[in-house]
UniProtKB/Swiss-Prot annotation:
InterPro entries: CRR_secretory_protein (IPR050581), GNK2 (IPR002902), GNK2_sf (IPR038408). Belongs to the cysteine-rich repeat secretory protein family. It is found in: Secreted. Keywords: Repeat, Secreted, Signal. Pfam families: Stress-antifung (PF01657). Residues 39-147, 160-267 form the Gnk2-homologous domain. Residues 1-32 form the signal peptide. The gene is CRRSP18. One of its GO terms (cellular component) is extracellular region. PANTHER family: CYSTEINE-RICH REPEAT SECRETORY PROTEIN 18-RELATED (PTHR32411:SF53), CYSTEINE-RICH REPEAT SECRETORY PROTEIN 38-RELATED (PTHR32411). This is Cysteine-rich repeat secretory protein 18. It comes from the Eukaryota.
């Protein structure tokens, strides 16, 4: 038998446990839907060398990054989620490119670009003429060359899940099928941009029910690529990194030109743009 005091303590603890459990579920839900903006990876590219302190290159670079903090400047790029701008002439030309995830356009895009830009310039790759950084919601690249419209085969990385698939619970063919279907949607889905011009969205997300489990995925290509370029980029990176992820429960493969992700849990809001349930 419980004493009256112990019973009262038990009843007091029940709502506390419920509240704590609810809060933990909410935190987990926010994290799983990728609403955070975590740093993922960066690369300092040595090919183009370094710029000198006080040079025209450094001044142009600083001016560009600082302008991103102004809500009235480059608002078009933040609203569309993509911008590529070149300033100056070689050898002091500076090319800045950023791409935001389509469901992170607007203020989220600007916040990510500002954070990533300063992180790359000041902490990760100071004085490098070419560097790239990836966050959850965006990538930022600066370079002394204009490479728009070209597939970048050099700057990439693979982030596999720490957990392996058990048996044949979700086959390689099923994962490839989802990624291929999402790529088809990304290159064939036409929508109007903020100027009313019809263009391929080059992005798709979705989920597929497989028995008792669901497989979630997302693909995105850089907005400067053509439909053919997007297809080629996705095919290359799916094959190139297959050994990295073929036995894993999830993976992120990111490059300068395209990226994809799949997981056994939801990481994209199903109410977001261009989401499909297969």
């Amino acid at each position: 038998m419980y004493s009256s005091s112990s019973v009262s303590k038990r009843f007091v603890l029940v709502p506390i446990v419920v509240v704590v459990t609810t809060q933990l579920l909410l935190v987990r839900n926010v994290s799983s839907l990728n609403l955070t903006n975590s740093y993922l990876h960066h690369k300092c590219v040595v090919n183009q060398g370094k710029y000198k302190p006080g040079s025209k290159y450094e001044k142009s670079l600083d001016d560009i990054i600082q302008s991103f903090s102004n809500k009235d400047k480059d608002s078009y790029g933040f609203r569309t989620g993509y911008s590529m701008k070149a300033y100056g002439k070689e050898p002091d030309m500076v090319s800045i490119t950023y791409q935001c995830r389509i469901d992170s356009r607007g203020p989220k895009c600007q916040s990510c670009v500002v954070t990533a830009g300063y992180e790359l310039l000041r902490k990760r790759c100071p004085r490098y003429k070419e560097a790239i950084i990836w966050y959850d919601q965006c990538l930022v690249e600066f370079s002394s060359l204009d490479t728009s419209g070209q597939i970048n085969y050099d700057d990439n990385f693979c982030m596999p899940s720490a957990k392996n698939l058990i048996g044949n619970s979700i086959s390689l063919e099923e994962r490839l099928h989802l990624l291929n279907n999402l790529t088809k949607i990304a290159v064939t889905k036409i929508d109007k941009n903020i100027e009313g011009i019809k263009k391929p969205v080059l992005y798709a997300a979705g989920e597929k029910r497989l028995g008792t489990k669901s497989l979630y995925g997302m693909v995105q290509c850089s907005a400067d690529l053509s439909v053919q370029g997007c297809n080629e980029c996705m095919l290359y990176y799916i094959v190139h990194f297959q050994e990295c992820w073929e036995n894993k429960q999830g993976v992120r493969v990111l490059s300068r030109s395209c990226n994809f992700r799949y997981e056994l849990y939801p990481f994209i809001n199903p109410k977001g743009p261009y989401y499909t349930k297969f």
